Amino acid sequence: MSVYAIAQLWIHDPMTYGRYVARFMDVFKNYKGRVLVADENPVVLEGAWDGNKVVVVSFPDEASFRDWAESQEYLEIATDRKAGARSVIVLVKGIPSRTEVAKTG
């Protein structure tokens, strides 16, 4: 089942965060994920939110996500993300495909 990592970011040190961004795709391309959203001007439709960036990435399953997120390559560059931005990141499961439903039902 597909999973999605949704990150809300508050970038407070653009230079440090920029080092992370500059290396991100070189690491990410080696894994099974897709970047679906990377928006530095999200529009709040309801509620209050003071973040200044939203990122959504998808993976075919949780194991693939963890292969990337827990890789030494990613952990090295993530230090710049953590130093340059405050983040809230959630991992959510997608809706099962018809094939996945048929296998379980």
Feature-to-residue mapping (PLM):
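Short S/T/G/P-rich N-terminal loop/turn motif that feeds into the first structured element of a domain
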Residues: 1-54, 60-70, 93-105
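Generic beta-strand structural signal
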Residues: 53-55, 87-88
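C-terminal structural segments of small proteins and small subunits
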Residues: 66, 74-92
